[in-house]
């Protein structure tokens, strides 16, 4: 733990102005008075005192044992785990709601509500505090999980039609809460070093892997479907609670408070912060002062006091009063977002295009890939390969490489090649061009890696392209782009699903694990 800068009054240090006037500086916050070189300057120049940010004699906090990084990884797990919990018990859903498209309807409900939530969160970013939004998000995510587990799965209080509607409503509530968390966390991570954004995004992929393993083991160990589903949901609830408690603990750590306070004061991260640290200085300017040549000072604005005694001026420095932040007007909010979007627009398009292409294919079109030998296991295998490779891609995003925004957008668009490749794995229905099961597995592997990588890199780098005080807003704007890509991809996938489902009875007779890797 670093020691704070001494806040005792330093011994007065005199400074000489070009006209021979003496300036005495008494500092209460480790400020220094420096004399600026005045050689070669016109003798008529006046001395002006300038105030900039204080230099804090505080050691940069360290993420000892990578505990903060691990907590942020679990944060990514926490805000996608409730959604994955509803989707991953696909066997229970298909058995209970036989002959319906419950999994697909829940996925579409999630995307549509999530888009509304991320836009609303973007509007409220200046109105509600960061941690208020995250806490509310956790409560909205946990509530439906508890309600469905107790009243629908355990007590079975509803009819089939009622349960269907309640599950969709629960998914919508989860979507709202989880998306508010997600959008807020991206803004939160924008204030921390880049690796923590990568940690959160890796956690998103980890959520799909963890919840899939949880469902596999509960189903293998407990044969009764209702009991293993209850235990599955209880495990999910406990994991979300752990993530929530970790968030409450981590937000109070010195590491997080140090970096978030830097960002809110408009300073860079620690290594840049040391370069910007400055003191009171005597600057020479051509601005005309009072007739007696006094050094100008604004007592009300700078919290200083001048005492004229001959040609001697004494300045006492006191901390600036904190100003209460008022809510901005609509025009200001639009202007703030426009200014940020002008800087990061290539990153916004990159992440939107990446997830649009992925959602066009996953899980909709991939679930239609059939094979006589592997049967219904092929789509499950393809989904598993995608989730694992997506996880690997997000880990690779941690490798330091400075991407140019235009190149990043180009490579994100190149991924469109996966669309015709997967179509050739499905059509023509009687004999697809890529009929061997290895082909869709290979395509899914590369699609997952590129989705994880190009879905993470724009989010990681975008916050570093704007001023520190704009980083939380940049993270929220990037999440709007991210969710826009998901929504547009889901709409296209829904059209493809309706088209293929009408001509195939195979899909209606089997249930697949549509665990989302995004």
From Swiss-Prot:
Topology in the lipid bilayer: Multi-pass membrane protein
GO CC field: plasma membrane
Keywords: Membrane, Phosphoprotein, Transmembrane, Transmembrane helix, Transport
Compartment annotation: Membrane
Extracellular side: 1-66, 121-133, 179-198, 251-342, 398-407, 461-476
Region of interest: Disordered: 1-21
TM segment ranges: 67-87, 100-120, 134-154, 158-178, 199-218, 230-250, 343-363, 377-397, 408-428, 440-460, 477-497
Sequence similarity: Belongs to the SLC29A/ENT transporter (TC 2.A.57) family.
Protein name stated in the entry: Equilibrative nucleoside transporter 4
Top-level taxonomy: Eukaryota, Metazoa, Chordata, Craniata, Vertebrata
Gene: slc29a4
């Amino acid at each position: 733990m670093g020691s704070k800068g001494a806040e005792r009054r330093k011994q007065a240090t005199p400074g000489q102005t070009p006209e021979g006037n003496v300036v005495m500086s008494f500092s209460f916050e480790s400020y220094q008075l420096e004399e600026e070189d005045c050689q070669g300057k016109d003798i008529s120049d006046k001395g002006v005192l300038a105030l900039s940010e204080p230099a804090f004699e505080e050691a940069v906090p360290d993420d000892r044992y990578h505990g903060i990084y691990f907590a942020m990884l679990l944060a990514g797990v926490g805000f996608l785990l409730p959604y994955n919990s509803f989707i991953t018990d696909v066997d229970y859903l298909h058995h209970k709601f036989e002959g319906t498209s419950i999994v697909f309807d829940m996925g579409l409900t999630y995307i549509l509500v999530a888009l509304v939530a991320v836009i609303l969160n973007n509007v409220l970013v200046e109105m509600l505090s960061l941690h208020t939004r995250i806490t509310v998000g956790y409560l909205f995510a946990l509530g439906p999980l508890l309600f469905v587990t107790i009243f629908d799965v355990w007590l079975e209080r509803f009819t089939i039609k009622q349960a269907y509607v309640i599950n969709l409503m629960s998914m919508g509530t989860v979507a709202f809460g989880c998306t508010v968390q997600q959008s807020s966390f991206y803004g939160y991570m924008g204030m921390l070093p880049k690796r923590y954004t990568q940690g959160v995004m890796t956690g998103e992929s980890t959520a799909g892997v963890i919840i899939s393993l949880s469902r596999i083991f509960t189903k293998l160990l407990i044969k009764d479907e209702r009991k293993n589903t209850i235990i599955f949901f209880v495990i999910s609830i406990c994991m979300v609670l752990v993530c929530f408690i970790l968030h409450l603990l981590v937000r109070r750590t010195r590491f997080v408070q140090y970096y978030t306070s830097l960002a809110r004061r408009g300073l860079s991260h620690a290594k840049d912060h040391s370069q910007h640290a400055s003191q009171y200085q005597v600057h020479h300017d051509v601005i005309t002062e009072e007739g007696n040549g006094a050094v100008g000072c604004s007592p009300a604005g700078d919290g200083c006091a001048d005492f004229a005694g001959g040609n001697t001026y004494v300045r006492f420095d006191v901390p600036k009063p904190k100003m209460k932040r008022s809510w901005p007007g609509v025009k200001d909010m639009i202007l703030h977002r426009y200014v940020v979007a002008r800087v990061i627009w290539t990153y916004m398009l990159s992440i939107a295009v990446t997830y649009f292409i992925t959602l066009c294919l996953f899980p909709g079109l991939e679930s239609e890939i059939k094979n006589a030998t592997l049967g219904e296991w092929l789509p499950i295998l393809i989904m598993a390969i995608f989730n694992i490779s997506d996880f690997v891609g997000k880990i690779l995003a941690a490798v330091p490489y400075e991407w140019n925004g235009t190149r990043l957008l180009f490579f994100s668009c190149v991924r469109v090649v996966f669309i015709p490749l997967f179509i050739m794995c499905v059509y023509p229905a009687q004999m697809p061009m890529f009929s061997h099961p290895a082909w869709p597995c290979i395509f899914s592997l590369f699609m997952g890696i590129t989705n994880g990588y190009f879905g993470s890199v724009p989010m990681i780098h975008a916050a570093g392209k704007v001023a520190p005080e704009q980083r939380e807003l940049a993270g929220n704007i990037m999440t709007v782009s991210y969710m826009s890509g998901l929504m547009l991809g889901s709409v296209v996938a829904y059209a493809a699903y309706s088209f293929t489902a009408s001509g195939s009875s195979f899909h209606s007779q089997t249930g697949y694990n549509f665990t989302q890797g995004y």
